[in-house]
Structure formats: structure tokens, C-alpha cells
Amino acid sequence: MAYINEINVTKQGDSIIFLDLNQSPAERAQSDHIRTLGIMGLHQSAERMGLPSTTMHWASYWDQEDVIKYIDKWLKTVGSTRPIFGFSNLFGLDIFGSTTEQPSNITLANKIKENFPDSKLIVGGPNPVCVTKPLVKLDALFYGRALWLMERWLQDKPIPKKNEDVNEFGIPIFFNDVAVIPEDPIVPDLHADYCLNEQDIVTFETRLGCKFNCTFCGYEFRGNKDPYNANEDHVLAFFEEAHSHGITRFSIVDDTFNEEKSKFDLMLNVTRQLDFQPRIVGFNRFDVLAHKPDQIGMLDEMGFHGHLWGIETFHPQASKAIRKTARTDKFFKVLEHIRDDYPHWWVTGSIIVGIPPETTDYSYEMAKRYIGEGLFSGVNLHALMVRKFAEGISESDADFAKDPMKYGITLTGKEHKDDMYADWTTATSSYREAEICKDRILKLGLRNGIGPVNPWNALSKDAIGHELFTTAGKERMAAGVKANHHIDNAKTYFTESWISDWELLIRNYVNRKMEYVETL
């Protein structure tokens, strides 16, 4: 553990506490408990600089008095009087503004500032845009993958003008160039500070960036033409260290794992040296898998058994519009093969309704087939979303958002000014029609025992004994979904089925953290 030494050379602070925040209200329990890679990477950076640092996973769900108690004890232990609080949030817009879904985050941040007035508050994440004026005094915002920018900020080093600005509320913001990879993939060391146990799921990257450039995607490192992989020895050491904590479940957070064979080679070389069988989940492109079926066996061998497949559409022309290649009959044959021969896989199909020129009738007909034939374990459904508050500054907006008319999308301007997504129409659909169709497909899925359960949800349930990577386990869940298909709010059943597990996980983790801080 690093204690105060030479770090007082920085004007920013003399320690840093990273808090993992979530947008979901406490009464709508989290459906997974994956350890967030962001704050592990940030913590690793701070440790490397000699800056005392600690992490607080799932801080939104701690009792707030416990948050203050832990911070106070830790700061006194390391002798810090000018702490920096780094709030990390995945996919959350306006987390401290009036449109937030989790107002208790505002209460928490203000309570921290009240108790530690000589502190600074910074926010990072894939898209930490302030849609409305923050109700918390913030000192900086770090957009996207910004470890290197935070490091320079912490050390008072110059930041390139093209990577900084000030937003409309006067808060300094820092962001990356598009498709320029500024740092290595994160393969974290597993510090005692994380208080891990055998129910945890830890994350890592084999590569930062994605070589594809889908028109609906706003990922800042898409279209990457100069990729490089994580160090194989580091990945092996990570798996072995995790297993020393009893951990056998992992999440690869690459944007698209199966984009290139070298990543398969890396993971096969690593997993063949392990003395345990890992269970891995992550993102893969289904069209690539369908055209390279040899990937299926390699994924199975390495333990990559949980998949979120960005299929998006089965419509050949619509798939061309997003720079993918749908071959309807071929897709269904591959899905049938995986259903029949890989029952120990959890596969979630991610579908976007409304991509032109696909009609909602076509979307629903396809859904009747993939749901009726049980080709997915879960479904991830969205109407086509055109973000209003994407990063913009770094030109990382999706092509659909940059130039919608080019793709036959007309923005109507009829949405509320604070809505996250623009209202739209096309020659074949509209945002409203796509939303209605999406809800119809979701209800169809529920009636057939297929819910909005992604592989991270499934792996989390598996980690606490529900065995969702078995035929019997999936059948039990399907029976529960069918029995509750009448519930109007599709998330209610899943909240009820997860909440007791989630509350127990958080309580046990907080207890471990409180015991840990007493040992320092």
C-alpha cells in the first residue's frame, strides 16, 4: 500500500478514491455483479504513480454512512488531507443532473464533499455528458477511455489542446482522438484492496479498439487500423491470480473479441496452460462467427461460453446499412447448430428494430422464428437510437447521428429537449413504431420463456449457484419467465429474482471492505 510520499508535488490532491456508481435505482436491483474494469485500471495507474488509492465497487448501493466511515478511516490511515474522488460510471448520462435515474448518487457526492471539503470531485466513463446543470460541484470530466489523460491531469503535465475543452457549465472536459489508441489493453493486477472472493467475476481486455466501423456505433476506438494485443504472460498471470481467490468466471470487455484470429491464439495459448476451466463471457459479432464457423470450436475450448451477439438485424439490406452482412438462412442454420450442439452456452441475441429499410413487420416475423425455435437464451432489444448527447467533441458520434439523412433517417425534433435520443422517421418505420415493435417482441419472448437476460446477468447468477450454463438451469429460468410473462414491466420479475442475491452480495462485500481498512 502506497502512503504519502512525494505526491504533494501535484496541485490536484494527495490521494484518490475511485467509486463505482450505477444509474439504476436501488429498488431496481442490479442484475449482474461484474467487477468494473474501469476503476481497477484507474487504481492501477494511481498505484504506479505512487499516489495512495483505494476502490469502492458498487458505491451507489452502499449505506451512505458506511461510505463516509470507510473513506474517513482510509484517509486517516494514509495521512491524506486533500483527497480526489473519482466517480466512474458505465453508460450513464447526466449522473449528477436533474434527469438522473439515481438521485441518491447526487446525495452521496454532496455528502462526500460536505464531509471532506478540501477534496476534488471528478467523473469518468464512456459518456459522462452533463445534459443538465450538475447538482454537484465537479472539477473535471474524463470522456471515454481516458486513463492517460487522468494521469497527466494528476501529475500537472500538459494536455494537448485537441484533447481538452470546457463544457457549457464551465467544467473542464478531457477526451480522446477517434481511432487513435493511446494506451495498452487493461489486464489488471488483483490488489488486496478489491476484497475478492470466489463469487466475483473479473474483467480484462485482450485488445483496445475495434477494426470495424458500424454506422450505428459511437465507440471512440472503432475503425482502428493499428491494433495490438495484450501481453500473453500478463493474461496468464491474471487468470492464475484470479484462481488463487477461487475465481473461475471472467468477462472479456473487448468491443468485438472475434474480430481477428490472433486474439483466439492468445486466449487458447493461455487457457491451455491453466489447471482449471474458466467460464468467459463477452461481445462477439455473429456475422463473423457465421462466416468463420471454425471459431465456434475455439471459443468452446477456451471456455468462452457466454455471448452477446450483435446481430442487430436479419434483413440483408438493413445489415448493409450498418456495414454488417446478414444472410438470413445461413444465420438460422448456425443458430440451430449452436442450440443443439452447445447447450452449455448462454447466447443473447442483440437486435435493433427500425434500421432502414427493414419494416417492423419483418422484425416481428424474424422474432417469431428465433424466439419460437428457442435459438437464443436471452434477448437484448432496442429501437434504433440516435443519441443526442454523444461525445461529439471528439468526433466519435455514430455515422447515423452525424449524417442521418445519408442513411434515410429524418430527425423530427419532436422529442423532449432533455431526452437522450432523437425522434426519427424513415421511409419504412419511425421511432415510435420501432419502440412498439420492440415491446411486442419482448412480450413474445417472455411468453416463450426468453427474457432480457444477457451473458453477464447469466454468469452472475451462475456464480451464486443458479447454474445457467446448463440445460436444466436454463429450463428452470425459462419456467419462471413463462409463469410471470403477464407482468407489464418486463424488468419486475428479474428484479425480484435477483434482488435478494444482489443485496447479500453487496452486504458481504461492504463487510469485507470494512475489515480490510482496519488491517492497513
Outline where the language-model segments fall:
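Short, electropositive alpha-helical surface patch
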Residues: 138, 144, 265-272, 359-377
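Radical SAM enzyme core and accessory elements
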Residues: 1-21, 27-28, 48, 52-54, ...
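Radical SAM [4Fe-4S] cluster-binding motif and immediate context
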Residues: 34, 181-348, 353-355
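A general structural detector for well-ordered alpha-helical segments in enzyme core domains, enriched
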Residues: 42, 70, 74, 101-112, ...
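Flexible glycine/acidic-rich beta-alpha junction loops that bind and position SAM and/or redox cofactors
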Residues: 25-29, 91-96, 127-133, 212, ...
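Non-catalytic positions within long, well-ordered alpha-helices that form the structural scaffold/packing
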Residues: 134, 243, 300, 371-372
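Acidic, low-complexity intrinsically disordered segments
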Residues: 2-241
